[in-house]
Design a protein with these regions (language model features):
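Short helix-to-turn junction characteristic of helix-turn-helix DNA-binding domains
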Residues: 28, 223, 274, 376, ...
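Helicase motor core with emphasis on the C-terminal RecA-like subdomain
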Residues: 2-11, 15-19, 23-45, 53-55, ...
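Accessory DNA-binding and partner-docking regions appended to nucleic-acid-acting proteins
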Residues: 1-4, 338-339, 350-355, 364-366, ...
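Flexible coil/turn residues that form the inter-helical turn or adjacent wing/linker of helix-turn-helix
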Residues: 165, 227, 379, 431, ...
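Short, charged low-complexity linear segments at domain edges
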Residues: 360-390
C-alpha cells in the first residue's frame, strides 16, 4: 500500500482521500509549497498531518485558536501521534517542559499560536531541531481584507526568515476571496505553490431560510423536534445570546452559552459542557466555533442573519462534520439588516489599519452584506446560490434545500410594477433610492420623505398596498437575486439592469418561493442524488453511542474523539464480528481498533444475541 494511504488508514481509519487532499499532500512530500482552499469540514488538517508523519523532523502548525489546538492534539494523541501545543493556556512550567520535549525530538507535530513565534524562547528552541514543514491554518487571517484579520499572523513572514534552510510552507483556509488569496501567497512568500481549490459543496447539509413572526417560538419548536441531537444557535449580539439562553433554560432545554462578555473561566466551562455532550445545545455569538471540531453537530441555527456569505458558510459548516446528514437553518427578519449594518459600521476599529484602509474594508463588508441579504430572500436553490457565490457552477436545483422544496408562485404582474417603480423613481430624481423608499412608494406611504420627493405622484404609488412591507421587500430582493435589479454596494440604492427589459418588454415570467411543501412531498436525500449517512440499525446505534460515552468519561475526552457518529452508524450497519471486520468500518484505524475493538465487538455480539434477525 502507498505510504500516505497506509498512514491514512492506520491512524485515521479511512481507505481513500477526499478531493484535493492527495495533491496537497504529495506537493509537501516533494518539497513544494502548497495552498489549499477547502470548505469547513473538507479535511484540511489531514493535508498537513499526513506529510508531517512521513517527513523527517517536526511540522509546525500555526493556528490562532486555543480550542482548535487542544482539540487537534487530543485527537492525534488518541491515534498514537506524538503532538503538542504551545499557547497562552499553558503555565510557564508547562511551556518549559514542552520546549525540553521539542529539543528531545519527542513530537512530530507542534501547534503554536502566532503570537509565540517571535519570542526568544521559542526561536531558541526551534533553532535546535529540524523543521520540515510550517503549515498555516486559517491562513485568511493574514489578510487585512479578510473577515478575520489578525495582525499577529504577519509575524509568520518574519519567523520564516529565521530559517537558514527554508522549510516547506503550506497554507489552508476555508474561505478566501481572490484578493485574500493573493495576500496569503504574498505575505507567506509561497514559492510557486501547488494550488488546490476544492468544491465548496457539502452534500450532507440541508439549507433553509425561514422568516417567522416569532424567532423565539420557532427555535423552541425546532429544538423540541431535535431533542436527542447536538446543535449550535448563532446570535449576532451578546444580548440575544443571554436572552435566548434564559428562555430555553426555562423551557427545560439542555443549553449553554458562549460570548466574549462572559468571564474566561465560564466560557471554557460552557465550551467543555458542549464538547463533552453534557449540554446538547450551544447558544453563541460568532466568537464560538472557529476551531471547534465537534463532529456530531446535527444542526446549526442562525437566529440572526450573518454579515457575509463567508461567515455564514463557515459557521453553518460546523454541522455534519462527520458526513452525517445535518441542517443549516437561518431565521431572517428585516431587523437583521439594521443590526448587521450597525455592526459593520462599528467594526473598523483595528488600529493596524489607516483611515483609508478602514473605509475600504467597510465598503467591502457592505458589498458582502448585500449578497447575504439576497441569499435570505432569493427564491432560487440555496445550494446553487452558495456555490455560485464561491465561484462554482451547480445545477439549478439541488432538490434538497428549503427553496427547492417550496411552492412556487408567479408574481409577474407585481414584478412589472416594482421594476416600473424603480425606473420611474430614477427618471424623476436622477438617482436611485434604497429598498425602503421603493417599498414605501409601492405601499402608499404618507411619510414626509415620500411626499417631499413627490413619489406619491408616480403611477406605481400605492399599487401594491395590499401586500405587507416585508412581502414587498421579499419580492424586490427576489428580483435582485434573479438579476432584474441591482443594489449599489456603497449607497445601497437599487436600480434596473439590462435584464429588466425581459420582464417589462419581452414577457418573461417571474416566480418566487412562498412556502415549503408538505414534508411527505419533499425529496429524500437519496432521491435528490445525495447519499447521506444514516444508521441502518437505530437501536444498535444507540447502544454503541452509550458505550462510546462510557469510554469518553473513563478517558476524560469528548465522545467524538473516541469515534464519530458516522463511524458508529457504519459500525451499526456492518456489525463487525472480528478485529479484521472492525478495521473495515469507516473511521477505524489500527490504533483505535487495538484499543477499542474488543469492547465494541462484544457489545455488538451481545446486542445480536438479544435481537436475532427475524
Amino acid at each position: 500500500m502507498d505510504a500516505k494511504l497506509n498512514i491514512l488508514n492506520q491512524y485515521f481509519g479511512y481507505s481513500s482521500f477526499r478531493a484535493g487532499q492527495e495533491k496537497l499532500i504529495d506537493a509537501q512530500l516533494a518539497g513544494r509549497d502548497a495552498f489549499g482552499v477547502m470548505p469547513t469540514g473538507g479535511g484540511k488538517s489531514l493535508c498537513y498531518q499526513i506529510p508531517a508523519l512521513l517527513s523527517d523532523g517536526v511540522t509546525l502548525v500555526v493556528c490562532p485558536l486555543i480550542s482548535l489546538m487542544k482539540d487537534q492534539v487530543q485527537a492525534l494523541k488518541k491515534v498514537g501521534v506524538p503532538a503538542a501545543y504551545i499557547n497562552s493556556s499553558l503555565t510557564p512550567n508547562q511551556i518549559r517542559r514542552a520546549y525540553r520535549n521539542i529539543e528531545d525530538n519527542m513530537y512530530k507535530i507542534i501547534y503554536v499560536a502566532p503570537e509565540r513565534l517571535l519570542t526568544d524562547s521559542f526561536l531558541s528552541t526551534i533553532s535546535r531541531v529540524h523543521v520540515s514543514i510550517v503549515a498555516v491554518d486559517e491562513a485568511h487571517c493574514i489578510s487585512q481584507w479578510g473577515q478575520d484579520f489578525r495582525p499577529s499572523y504577519l509575524h509568520i513572514t518574519e519567523f520564516l526568515n529565521y530559517f537558514e534552510h527554508r522549510p516547506v510552507v503550506s497554507a489552508f483556509t476555508a474561505t478566501a476571496t481572490p484578493q485574500v488569496r493573493d495576500d496569503i501567497i504574498h505575505y507567506l512568500g509561497l514559492q510557486s505553490p501547488v494550488y488546490v481549490v476544492t468544491s465548496f459543496d457539502r452534500p450532507n447539509l440541508r439549507f433553509d431560510v425561514l422568516k417567522p413572526s416569532s424567532k423565539e417560538g420557532t427555535v423552541i419548536k425546532l429544538l423540541q423536534e431535535r431533542q436527542d441531537k447536538s446543535g449550535i444557535i448563532y446570535c449576532s449580539t451578546r444580548k440575544d445570546v443571554d436572552n435566548l439562553t434564559d428562555t430555553l433554560l426555562d423551557k427545560g432545554f439542555a443549553v449553554t452559552k458562549y460570548h466574549a462578555g462572559l468571564p474566561e473561566v465560564e466560557r471554557h466551562e460552557n465550551q467543555d459542557d458542549f464538547i463533552y455532550d453534557r449540554r446538547s445545545v450551544m447558544v453563541a455569538t460568532n466568537a464560538f466555533g472557529m476551531g471547534i471540531d465537534k463532529s456530531n453537530v446535527a444542526y446549526v441555527i442562525h437566529y440572526n442573519m450573518p454579515q457575509s456569505m463567508e461567515a455564514y458558510y463557515q459557521e453553518a459548516g460546523r454541522a455534519g462534520r462527520d458526513g452525517s446528514e445535518a441542517e443549516c437553518i437561518l431565521l431572517f427578519s428585516a431587523r437583521d439588516i439594521i443590526t448587521a449594518k450597525f455592526l459593520i459600521e462599528h467594526s473598523s476599529e483595528n488600529e493596524e489599519l489607516t483611515d483609508e484602509q478602514k473605509t475600504q474594508v467597510q465598503k467591502q463588508a457592505m458589498q458582502r452584506l448585500v449578497k447575504m441579504i439576497s441569499y435570505c430572500r432569493t427564491s432560487k436553490c440555496l445550494r446553487s446560490y452558495i456555490l455560485e457565490y464561491f465561484g462554482e457552477s451547480h445545477p439549478e436545483s439541488c432538490g434538497h434545500c428549503g427553496n427547492c422544496n417550496a411552492t412556487m408562485e408567479d408574481f409577474t404582474p407585481q414584478a412589472k410594477i416594482i421594476l416600473s417603480c424603480v425606473g420611474h423613481i430614477y427618471a424623476m430624481l436622477g438617482y436611485s433610492v434604497g429598498i425602503t423608499m421603493v417599498v414605501r412608494t409601492l405601499s402608499g406611504s404618507r411619510e414626509e420623505r415620500v411626499l417631499n420627493l413627490n413619489l406619491d405622484t408616480l403611477a406605481e404609488y400605492s399599487q401594491l398596498s395590499k401586500y405587507s412591507r416585508n412581502d414587498l421587500r421579499d419580492m424586490i430582493t427576489c428580483l435582485e437575486a434573479l438579476g432584474y435589479l441591482r443594489t449599489d454596494p456603497e449607497h445601497l440604492g437599487i436600480s434596473l439592469t439590462r435584464r429588466s427589459r425581459e420582464v417589462l418588454v419581452d414577457g418573461a415570467r417571474v416566480t418566487r418561493a412562498v412556502e415549503e411543501k408538505a414534508a411527505k412531498e419533499k425529496k429524500s436525500p437519496e432521491k435528490s442524488g445525495k447519499k447521506l449517512s444514516k444508521e441502518k440499525d437505530p437501536e444498535l446505534f444507540a447502544v454503541l453511542k452509550n458505550l462510546r460515552t462510557q469510554i469518553a468519561v473513563e478517558e476524560h475526552v469528548p465522545a467524538y474523539i473516541v469515534f464519530s457518529d458516522a463511524t458508529l452508524a457504519d459500525m451499526a450497519g456492518k456489525k463487525p464480528a472480528s478485529l479484521d471486520d472492525f478495521l473495515q468500518v469507516s473511521g477505524v484505524g489500527s490504533v483505535k481498533a487495538a484499543k477499542y475493538g474488543e469492547r465494541f465487538i462484544a457489545e455488538i455480539r451481545d446486542y445480536i444475541a438479544v435481537n436475532p434477525k427475524e
